[in-house]
UniProtKB/Swiss-Prot annotation:
Substrate binds at residues 75-76. This is Inosine/xanthosine triphosphatase. The keyword Protease does not apply. Its cofactor is Mg(2+); Mn(2+). The keyword Metal-binding applies. It catalyses: XTP + H2O = XDP + phosphate + H(+); ITP + H2O = IDP + phosphate + H(+). Belongs to the YjjX NTPase family. It comes from the Bacteria.
């Protein structure tokens, strides 16, 4: 696939989260300025905990989302899985992008979490729930995320996902340097 993608290509996003969908749309249109895309969000399981608590579990969640999106929708040109997780006192996300022939992956920047947030995570479902409780917000995970709260809106969940997605798209934007890695 070259940078001059002409036909409309369907991008299946393994999430209905608006922050994730916005990031995927932004990354694809930035990476392929001449491309035409249709973006479709699907609700598929990650098959990991609601709040993954390690790098490997988070990565597996993103891979599983792509696999499950492919099983759900066979009509995609690209499949995108994003999974946010925590390892120790930092949060981050893994992004996985697959076509029928290639896979690209990248981990986002890491963000330190306050000690009181880490302590409360032991008794909560997800980081977003704890952030809402500690910061008095509502549904922050579908808005700017923990990162927007802790950076005074200098960064958002979507902006950090955008960077990781651009990096995961490298095999697709430079196909002459990346042979097919999926069979």
């Amino acid at each position: 696939m070259s940078k001059k993608i002409m036909a409309t290509q369907k991008v299946i996003i393994a999430s209905l989260n608006p922050a994730k969908i916005t990031a995927v749309e932004s990354a694809f249109t930035s990476a392929f300025p001449n491309g035409t895309f249709e973006f479709v969000g699907v609700n598929v399981p990650s098959e990991v905990a609601d709040q993954p608590m390690s790098d490997s579990e988070t990565h597996l969640g993103a891979l599983n989302r792509v696999r499950n999106a492919k099983a759900c929708r066979a009509d995609g040109a690209f499949y995108v899985g994003l999974e946010a997780g925590i390892d120790g006192n930092v949060t981050f996300a893994w992004t996985v992008i697959e076509s029928h022939t290639h896979r690209g992956e990248s981990r986002s920047a890491s963000l330190m979490l306050p000690p009181n947030v880490i302590a409360k995570l032991a008794n909560a479902n997800e980081l977003g729930d704890v952030m809402d409780e500690v910061f008095g917000t509502e549904n922050i995970k579908q808005k700017g995320g923990a990162i927007s709260l802790l950076t005074q809106n200098q960064l958002t969940r979507s902006s950090v996902y955008h960077q990781a997605l651009i990096l995961a798209l490298i095999p697709f934007t430079n196909p002459e340097h990346f042979p097919a890695n999926l069979s």
